[in-house]
Swiss-Prot record:
Transmembrane segments: none
Any one GO molecular-function label of the UniProt entry: uracil phosphoribosyltransferase activity
Cited Gene3D superfamilies: 3.40.50.2020
Encoding gene (name): upp
Regulation: Allosterically activated by GTP.
Pathway: Pyrimidine metabolism; UMP biosynthesis via salvage pathway; UMP from uracil: step 1/1
UniProt similarity note: Belongs to the UPRTase family.
Cofactor(s) the protein requires to work: Mg(2+)
Name this polypeptide is given: Uracil phosphoribosyltransferase
């Protein structure tokens, strides 16, 4: 099953704190990074390993290292930036591809306004990070872009997801695995995830939050 709802106690606890409406920008931002790191741990569990040797304090030691898998982290602007440092804390050597996708608040349709992708995407695992998977429009636009550029292995890391967004992604891209801290109930009339987290971008950057 390509949908992974990670119900680890640490993730459940941290996500519960993030749902508080009175949480400070600083705390929300820090928790976004922490949950992003925990999702990265789950999403990278099957990376291949190869044996190598290092000189240890008592002589040569056989160790394991990640083998032959280049990684690019793909934050969807702007809210995806809030999860980026959490991912890089575990995979510091990953290259970063940046994608800007905006949603029309009337039609809820996504349009791309920025594309800065790293090279050799055909040899890379792409980890897309975005706090919210709501209608799926931004995620679909990003996946489409990566595949056009030659990327063959894509995983999405989101804090909360709505069933309609998950279905939209899997209907078009059944090969993409989705890792989320929570599958929430659905969307309200404005396209916000319920109960969700509110506007994650506003909460991460401390800008004015839109009414739901």
């Amino acid at each position: 099953m390509p949908v992974h709802e990670i119900r680890h106690p640490l993730i459940r606890h941290k996500l519960g704190i993030m749902r508080r409406a009175d949480l400070s920008t600083k705390s929300f931002r820090e928790l976004s990074q922490e949950v992003g790191a925990l999702l990265t741990y789950e999403a990278s569990k099957d990376l291949p390993l190869a044996e190598s040797t290092v000189e240890g304090w008592c002589g040569t030691v056989t160790v394991e290292k990640i083998a032959g898998k280049k990684v690019t982290v793909v934050p969807i602007l702007r809210a995806g930036i809030g999860m980026l440092d959490g991912v890089l804390s575990l995979i510091p050597g990953a290259k970063v591809s940046v994608v800007g996708v905006a949603r029309n608040e009337e039609t809820l349709q996504a349009h791309t306004y920025l594309e800065r992708l790293v090279g050799e995407l055909d040899q890379r695992l792409a980890l897309i990070v975005d706090p919210m998977l709501a209608t799926g429009g931004s995620m679909l636009a990003t996946i489409d872009m990566l595949k056009r550029a030659g990327c063959r292995e894509i995983r999405a890391l989101v804090l909360v997801a709505a069933p309609v967004g998950i279905k939209a992604v899997l209907d078009r891209h059944p090969d993409v695995h989705i890792y989320t801290a929570s599958i929430d109930d659905g969307l309200n009339e404005n396209g916000y995830i319920m109960p969700g987290l509110g506007d994650a971008g506003d909460r991460i950057f401390g800008t004015k939050q839109k009414a739901e």
